């Protein structure tokens, strides 16, 4: 079963990008490569249950098992030693990536309080977009009563776009609600 967002990309977005940026080949048109969800759990140093809860919440949001991230260096000020588990991340590709982006655009972002669109300044210079979510409760899979602590997460949308302008055009054509 083909995702509606993937179908929209193939039938509407890609031809529009080709005509706007004068590409000579279909393969030159920017496309989504992957979406990475990252949840840093700094208080996992003192209580490992917090990390387990973050992993299970990320599993519900993403629909696949996250990997636990570990500290690369020891930092005495944070009581952190190399190799300690301090967060989790998950990489979505293919159908799951399009399903997640569809859910993010149409369900989760409209549930953010005082939402006026996402910032257009969060591109990295190479067409990739980073979005910070302050609370995981905006996702419909998370039950409000089961959450003991509000956590945020980072969402990185990696595209094959060469410039920020191409990346912005790709995401806005896919329906990402950017602030005016």
Curated annotation (Swiss-Prot):
InterPro entries: Ribosomal_uL5, Ribosomal_uL5_bac-type, Ribosomal_uL5_C, Ribosomal_uL5_CS, Ribosomal_uL5_dom_sf, Ribosomal_uL5_N. GO terms for biological process: translation. Pfam families: Ribosomal_L5 (PF00281), Ribosomal_L5_C (PF00673). GO terms for cellular component: ribonucleoprotein complex; ribosome. GO terms for molecular function: rRNA binding; structural constituent of ribosome; tRNA binding. The keyword tRNA-binding applies. Keywords: Ribonucleoprotein, Ribosomal protein, RNA-binding, rRNA-binding, tRNA-binding. It comes from the Bacteria. Part of the 50S ribosomal subunit; part of the 5S rRNA/L5/L18/L25 subcomplex. Contacts the 5S rRNA and the P site tRNA. Forms a bridge to the 30S subunit in the 70S ribosome. This is one of the proteins that bind and probably mediate the attachment of the 5S RNA into the large ribosomal subunit, where it forms part of the central protuberance. In the 70S ribosome it contacts protein S13 of the 30S subunit (bridge B1b), connecting the 2 subunits; this bridge is implicated in subunit movement. Contacts the P site tRNA; the 5S rRNA and some of its associated proteins might help stabilize positioning of ribosome-bound tRNAs. Belongs to the universal ribosomal protein uL5 family. This is Large ribosomal subunit protein uL5. It comes from Oenococcus oeni (strain ATCC BAA-331 / PSU-1).
